[in-house]
């Protein structure tokens, strides 16, 4: 039986699932604002605290280490505790790590300060690791399969819009109140969102008192019949041994080297290699993530159209096989352009084309894993952040020596390799 037809406006205003998704969007936005602040403030932090660019790279690496290491455990914990409790814990710990970072220099200095900053970045990574795996499990429970790639794309918009907003906001605040307050004050709204989620959020539609019978009828019966909190060692091993999930993970490693290259290093690249000043770099550095946010939203819809037209297997394959090589080519174009503004435009386009693929990666994993989506996307995003673990020290070393072009060439090669992996991925074969 087909779900009842309702208007898009009525769904957005009267359906609880869209309010739940609004929280997921907000979590992604807040998480990326918290993550990117240190990178933008690095140009002021380095001379103020006597920290080198390589050390800044290690601070970013500490976050990615915690973030990568706890992706899969975070997904498993999310399945065990449920999204309501897990997101509340994530929010509290990440908030504390964020606000303690600018306060640490008041108490410590030298090596002790660097170790404290390293520990706080590691803690933030551990805390935030579960956001996207647990969020994907919420999407699996609250939305029909044909919407998964679309809403994953929209969530990508949230995180990229935060990445776009961070450079100008932090740069402007640094110019007026200093880098410490620039990192502290924007963190405070997160507390309100966490409190609202703890009050309103639920793990599944069946648990929410405001979900009507009409809304339940619109949802996927298979998702409603499964409990996301049941997890066993056997099911974990099925996730870890699945060929398509492993290939998705390897491909995501390759893609995320490029993701971190543009997302984390664009600001410093514009300052050091293209010789823009701090404020202008702050404004220009928001262009690539804005473009990437639009790319994420468009990509989710494109995947849905392709799946409807070509079926699940090729519908998910086609976009990454085309978009990843295109993005890799565009970053080479960017670093070889003489016009600095043209380089910004090429980087923005490369990032947008790269982020077209988010809906394909996450949506395919959800199709394969179904009720084990939290664990499976934890595996996927572990791979994605291994790309960052590999890439951050490489880019820090190469950029510190002025060899930015070499860092971008590596990205081109990995983008091509990531596209090849998709030939072996079949999202039409689910686990179990």
What are these regions (language model features)?
Residues 36, 64-72, 129, 163-164, ...:
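Residue-level signature of mid-helix packing/kink "hotspots" within the transmembrane helices
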Residues 155-208:
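Helix-loop-helix hairpin linking two adjacent transmembrane segments in secondary transporters
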Residues 92-110, 325-338:
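C-terminal ends and interior cores of transmembrane alpha-helices
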Residues 120-159:
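Cytoplasmic helix-loop-helix junction between adjacent transmembrane helices
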Residues 38-40, 241-297, 358, 362:
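Extracytoplasmic gate region of multi-pass secondary transporters
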Residues 19-53, 262-267:
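Extracytoplasmic
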Residues 97, 112-130, 341-356:
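Hydrophobic core of transmembrane alpha-helices in multi-pass small-molecule transporters
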Residues 313-360:
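C-terminal transmembrane helical hairpin of 12-TM major facilitator-type secondary transporters
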